[in-house]
Amino acid sequence: MAGEAASPPLKVLAAQLRAAGRGAGGTWRLSRTETGRAPLCLRAVWMQGTVLQVERGGGGSARLRDGSGHFTVLGVEDVPRGRPCLSAGKYVMVMGMVRACSPEPVLRAIKMTDLSENPVHEEMWGLEVEELHRVIP
């Protein structure tokens, strides 16, 4: 895909990503058959969830849960502002490159931010994702 502009991270829920399959050139194909639309090809995603567990060392990893399921984020100790987010119960935003989708999504972290201070972030997340996917052609 040389010469193509990189797509921004796509907001997704764990359940949506879990159903994605391998695409061409290292992309993942996010199915949208239920809406009658063509699949979306993606490499990077934006996800939000509550930190359940953190493993230190080797770049670190974290297990998170959003309203639709669980996902794992690798390299959490290597991203700017990642370490302050690394405690159970924090609600965080993660941008990352998709490494696997099944049986559970696995991301390599690019960016993490703690969103715990404002509960509106968690309350609105599912609606934000739903609205975005409704307007993407």
Curated annotation (Swiss-Prot):
GO terms for biological process: DNA repair; DNA replication; double-strand break repair via homologous recombination; maintenance of rDNA; negative regulation of double-strand break repair via homologous recombination; regulation of sister chromatid segregation; resolution of DNA recombination intermediates. InterPro entries: NA-bd_OB-fold (IPR012340), RMI2 (IPR032245). One of its GO terms (cellular component) is nuclear speck. Residues 45-115 bind DNA. GO terms for molecular function: DNA binding. It comes from the Eukaryota. Keywords: DNA replication, DNA-binding, Nucleus. It is found in: Nucleus. The keyword DNA-binding applies. Essential component of the RMI complex, a complex that plays an important role in the processing of homologous recombination intermediates. It is required to regulate sister chromatid segregation and to limit DNA crossover. Essential for the stability, localization, and function of BLM, TOP3A, and complexes containing BLM. In the RMI complex, it is required to target BLM to chromatin and stress-induced nuclear foci and mitotic phosphorylation of BLM. Belongs to the RMI2 family. Component of the RMI complex, containing at least TOP3A, RMI1 and RMI2. The RMI complex interacts with BLM. This is RecQ-mediated genome instability protein 2. It comes from Gallus gallus. The gene is RMI2.
